Every structure is written in C-alpha cells, then in structure tokens.
C-alpha cells in the first residue's frame, strides 16, 4: 500500500459548557498509512489528562483519536491545539480546537446524549377535541437545544399539506442552560376525529437534518363508554372524608375526559386513573372524588361527567346522592 497522509479533524463539545466543569477535547486522525503517527497537545505543554487510543486499521488505512481533558476555565478562553506528525509522509498538522455545534457542515464532534436535541409531539386534550367551544391543539416540543443555536424553525403539515396557523413561542432557557421551544397548531375538531395526520418538522442549524414527528388519532372502531357510580362504603363512613367512585368501561379510543360536579358546581378534589386496556381491547378507568362526610350525608347531588367521541353529543353523566336510611 502506498504512503497516505492523515486528515485531521478537531473534536469539540456540541454545546456551551457550565462553569467549574471539565471538558474533553479531541483530535481525529483519519485515513493514514503506514503507522505511526504522534499526537501531542500544545506541542507537549499539555500532558496530563491526555489519552491517545490505539489505531484501528480499516480498508487499508489507519485511524486513531486522541483526547485531552481540561477545566472549562481553561478552554475556550485559552488556545488548545493538537499537533499531529506522520513521519512516513513528512506531514505535520496543527489543529486548533474551537467551539462548534453538532450539525450543519460540522466535522465529527464529541456529543453526549444529553447534548442532542429531542423532539416530541403531543395530541390535543380530549376535553378540547370533544367540546365545540374549545380549540384543540397539537403540540410540538423541542428540548435540549444548545444555547449556541437556540433558534429552531417549525413547519406543520396536515395530511402532507403545509399549514401556517401554528403559534410558536420564543425559546425558553431551562435550568440546565439548554433551551426549550414549543409550537402549537390549532386544529379542527373533526380533523382529529376523522383521523387526519399531523406532522411537525423541526429545522435548526444545530441539526444535521430536519427532525419530523407525526401523530393522529388511534385507529379502531369507536366503542361507547358505560358509566357507573358507587357510593362510599359503610366501612368508610367512620372517616371524616369519604370516596365517591365513578367507573367508566368499555370505551375506545382511550381519549376520554372525566370530571365531577356537586349540585352542578365543578369539583377539584378528584383523581382519575389512566385509561387501562381491558381483556377485550376496550379501555376502562376509575375516578375517585373525595368529599367531607357531612357533604355526603347532607344529601348533596354528585355528578360524574364523561366526554368521549362515542357518546351522543360526546357527553354523558351519572349522578348519585345519599339517601337517608342507607
């Protein structure tokens, strides 16, 4: 094989660094023949924290990496350079390590998982979809955005047709010095219920390529929920606070909204279990309202209100109250 000089790439972290931390910088020495190469840092002035890994032979050429770990107070405020020598080709290369982002035309760089942005898409809230006076929204969230490149651009598509009605908030800085960006697309109730597909496309200078996420209503035959209410048990009546329970079963899809009223007034002191798949593939959940025992004993009317697309007008409710003598 003929003598081949190496290509040298500086390796830098993908995001800005916290103060009082250590930072690992690297040099990738790629595609040379024959061995050896030597790698020093700042012409040998940096020697502690250096790791030069054994060369790997691939397709007749060698590649190796060398790294150095320095305090973030040292870099990038002070210059760090890797010095590569390949005697066989009389090559000497000095590469200064400069801060850079992962992505775009960036050469290989050291990126840990926590420094790579993630994109998530969320469905509209069932209450918004099933209430004609509310506006359902599909939400796209980007997290772990580098403060070097906090700007991201959202594009939205409904069944592959681009729409321009989304509301995008400015990036918000998080406690870990990364940014978070949120875009919300208001949608038509029937577009979601009819199973149209919503796609969020996110582009950024920090991404090698756009990231896309898609969401739509779960497929399957709609099944109507059955609603049952249960009074507090006799054993529980020894307590100061009692539980009124609503069981909702046999519904599909799992998107559902359950809330409580007392004498027509909304109540807050309740908890719902997540919709859980039953043995027949439909879903069920329990909702538990906690009330003061005297409120129950006074004969107040408690109503479990359910919103689901399988119901007439998307709504049903079941009420119960204490009957003296029970």
Swiss-Prot record:
<dbReference type="Pfam" id="PF07654">
    <property type="entry name" value="C1-set"/>
</dbReference>
<keyword id="KW-0325">Glycoprotein</keyword>
<dbReference type="GO" id="GO:0034987">
    <property type="term" value="F:immunoglobulin receptor binding"/>
</dbReference>
<keyword id="KW-0393">Immunoglobulin domain</keyword>
<feature type="disulfide bond">
    <location>
        <begin position="27"/>
        <end position="82"/>
    </location>
</feature>
<feature type="region of interest" description="CH2">
    <location>
        <begin position="113"/>
        <end position="219"/>
    </location>
</feature>
<dbReference type="InterPro" id="IPR013783">
    <property type="entry name" value="Ig-like_fold"/>
</dbReference>
<feature type="glycosylation site" description="N-linked (GlcNAc...) asparagine">
    <location>
        <position position="176"/>
    </location>
</feature>
<feature type="disulfide bond">
    <location>
        <begin position="140"/>
        <end position="200"/>
    </location>
</feature>
<feature type="region of interest" description="CH1">
    <location>
        <begin position="1"/>
        <end position="97"/>
    </location>
</feature>
<dbReference type="InterPro" id="IPR036179">
    <property type="entry name" value="Ig-like_dom_sf"/>
</dbReference>
<dbReference type="InterPro" id="IPR007110">
    <property type="entry name" value="Ig-like_dom"/>
</dbReference>
<feature type="region of interest" description="Hinge">
    <location>
        <begin position="98"/>
        <end position="112"/>
    </location>
</feature>
<protein>
    <recommendedName>
        <fullName>Ig gamma-1 chain C region</fullName>
    </recommendedName>
</protein>
<dbReference type="InterPro" id="IPR050380">
    <property type="entry name" value="Immune_Resp_Modulators"/>
</dbReference>
<dbReference type="InterPro" id="IPR003597">
    <property type="entry name" value="Ig_C1-set"/>
</dbReference>
<dbReference type="GO" id="GO:0042571">
    <property type="term" value="C:immunoglobulin complex, circulating"/>
</dbReference>
<keyword id="KW-1015">Disulfide bond</keyword>
<dbReference type="GO" id="GO:0003823">
    <property type="term" value="F:antigen binding"/>
</dbReference>
<feature type="disulfide bond">
    <location>
        <begin position="246"/>
        <end position="304"/>
    </location>
</feature>
<dbReference type="GO" id="GO:0019731">
    <property type="term" value="P:antibacterial humoral response"/>
</dbReference>
<feature type="region of interest" description="CH3">
    <location>
        <begin position="220"/>
        <end position="326"/>
    </location>
</feature>
<dbReference type="GO" id="GO:0006958">
    <property type="term" value="P:complement activation, classical pathway"/>
</dbReference>
